[in-house]
């Protein structure tokens, strides 16, 4: 279940989280992951074959999202403290940036933090297992792992070409520090 952390407020109620994110133009849902995947998802890392097994086990979700949102492809990203180059990888996304295509994540294990500056307001969304978030194109955000240093997320794409981060000067978008 996602948690919103703002300057002087924390929102944990599922309905309030969804309402707040909807108001900010983000899509948030909470989906249960199939219990049949629990054993494999409990592993720290996954081989390519295991990633394919997980994606196959979630094919029903992809089919739903293709119909609802027009996604054409998906993949599974597995990040943890033993991934070679993890610090450099995270450094690409822990600074304020946008993408020219929407960013869509379904968290199936672990946890992380998406940060946003929308309408001049800074807030964080702490995501965990079962959280689905869609960030519209050109939305100021950043991402980092939390203290667990572990996340598995299915990424959904309409077009892979919009995935280069375009960095944003925070001082030009932050009004309500």
Curated annotation (Swiss-Prot):
Under the heading Gene3D superfamilies, the entry gives: Jelly Rolls
Q: Does the keyword Oxidoreductase apply?
A: yes
Q: Per the entry, which co-factors are needed?
A: Fe(2+); Ni(2+)
Q: Which residues bind Ni(2+)?
A: 97, 99, 103, 141
Sites where the protein binds Fe(2+): 97, 99, 103, 141
Coiled coil segments of this chain: none
Q: What are the EC numbers?
A: 1.13.11.54, 1.13.11.53
In Gene Ontology terms, what is a biological process of this protein?
L-methionine salvage from S-adenosylmethionine
Q: Which reaction does it catalyse?
A: 1,2-dihydroxy-5-(methylsulfanyl)pent-1-en-3-one + O2 = 3-(methylsulfanyl)propanoate + CO + formate + 2 H(+); 1,2-dihydroxy-5-(methylsulfanyl)pent-1-en-3-one + O2 = 4-methylsulfanyl-2-oxobutanoate + formate + 2 H(+)
InterPro entries per UniProt: ARD, ARD_bac, RmlC-like_jellyroll, RmlC_Cupin_sf
Class of the enzyme per the UniProt entry, highest EC level: oxidoreductase
Pathway(s) annotated for this protein in UniProt: Amino-acid biosynthesis; L-methionine biosynthesis via salvage pathway; L-methionine from S-methyl-5-thio-alpha-D-ribose 1-phosphate: step 5/6
* Classification via Pfam families: ARD
Details of cofactor binding: Binds 1 Fe(2+) cation per monomer. Binds 1 nickel ion per monomer.
Keyword Metal-binding, does the record have it?
yes
Indicate the quaternary assembly.
Answer: Monomer.
Q: What is this protein called?
A: Acireductone dioxygenase
Q: Which organism is it from?
A: Leptospira biflexa serovar Patoc (strain Patoc 1 / ATCC 23582 / Paris)
């Amino acid at each position: 279940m996602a948690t919103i952390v703002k300057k002087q407020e924390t929102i944990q109620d599922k309905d309030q989280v969804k309402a707040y994110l909807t108001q900010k133009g983000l899509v948030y849902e909470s989906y249960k992951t199939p219990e049949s995947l629990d054993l494999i998802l409990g592993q720290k890392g996954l081989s390519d074959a295991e990633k394919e097994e997980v994606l196959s086990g979630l094919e029903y979700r992809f089919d739903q999202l293709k119909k609802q949102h027009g996604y054409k492809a998906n993949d599974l990203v597995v990040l943890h403290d033993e991934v070679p180059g993890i610090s450099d990888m995270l450094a690409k996304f822990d600074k304020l940036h946008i993408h020219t295509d929407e960013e869509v994540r379904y968290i199936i294990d672990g946890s992380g933090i998406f940060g946003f500056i929308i309408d001049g307001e800074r807030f964080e969304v702490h995501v965990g297992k079962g959280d689905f978030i869609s960030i519209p194109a050109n939305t100021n955000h950043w991402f980092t792992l939390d203290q667990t240093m572990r996340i598995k997320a299915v990424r959904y794409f309409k077009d892979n070409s919009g995935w280069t981060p375009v960095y944003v000067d925070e001082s030009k978008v932050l009004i309500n520090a």
